[in-house]
A protein has these predicted regions:
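Extracellular glycan-targeting catalytic surfaces
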Residues: 1-163, 175, 179, 199-202, ...
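Hydrophobic/aromatic side-chain positions at a characteristic register within alpha-helices
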Residues: 79-82, 185-189
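Loop-centered beta-sheet repeat module
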Residues: 167-185, 191
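Long, repeat-rich segments with strong aromatic
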Residues: 186-214
Length: 217
């Protein structure tokens, strides 16, 4: 697998160059990231044993949503500013999730949680894979965590879609699970999983298939 994920080194170098030159609109856009509460070196995440979405009175999925956002933004600042303190904090936050979270649960909405946050955690981890301070055993644990916690739910939704008609769910449900499969496949070096996502995008039976999802844009 090619390990550039969502962003390439050329992307990051272009951002660094625009930032160094103080060019607009790039510098103002970057300032929004700098000012984000989630991108700070001190930003902590609060993992839960179960990510719950669609559980009346007991939902906590925003912990995962914020957690993935924090790690992603910290990873972005590390790649752009090349300050290892951002990467160290991002890895600390990811390790907390790996050590704490064992699954995703809820009603049918658990499939949104698995797709959205599985994708977001995976792309954040991919950004950090080359950080020398991420112990290789911890990185392997992160890879296994994605495969255990998110991938089964992604796969089940795209195959079974909660025992409904294949076209029952709007495209966003399917597309986030496709994106999660592709991102997880890349960061875990599982081309078979990546190919599953591509195959569903091209020929799947749900509204995540491009020929069906495009009409909803």
């Amino acid at each position: 697998m090619l390990h550039e994920g969502l962003h390439t080194e050329e992307d990051f170098q272009r951002i660094r160059d625009k930032k160094a030159a103080g060019e607009e609109p790039w510098i103002s856009a970057y300032q929004l990231l700098v000012e984000s509460q989630f991108s700070q070196k001190t930003a902590d995440t609060y993992p839960t044993e179960w990510i719950k979405r669609g559980v009346s009175g007991d939902e906590n999925y925003m912990n995962a949503a914020r957690g993935a956002t924090i790690v992603y933004q910290q990873a972005l600042r590390w790649k752009i500013e090349q300050d290892d303190e951002y990467a160290a904090k991002a890895v600390e936050n990811l390790n907390k999730w790996v050590q704490t979270c064992v699954g995703v649960t809820g009603n049918t909405n658990l499939s949104l949680a698995a797709g959205l946050y599985g994708y977001e955690f995976a792309i954040a981890g991919e950004l950090l894979r080359d950080y020398g301070g991420w112990d290789r055993a911890d990185f392997a644990a992160f890879q296994n965590w994605l495969l255990k916690v998110f991938y089964p739910a992604n796969d089940d939704f795209l195959k079974r879609h909660h025992d409904t008609n294949a076209l029952h769910y709007w495209a966003n449900w399917c597309l986030c699970n496709i994106a999660a499969k592709m991102a997880i496949g890349i960061v875990t070096d599982r081309r078979d999983i990546y190919n599953e996502g591509i195959a569903h995008l091209q020929t799947g039976d749900t509204n995540g298939r491009l020929r069906l999802s495009l009409i909803h844009i």
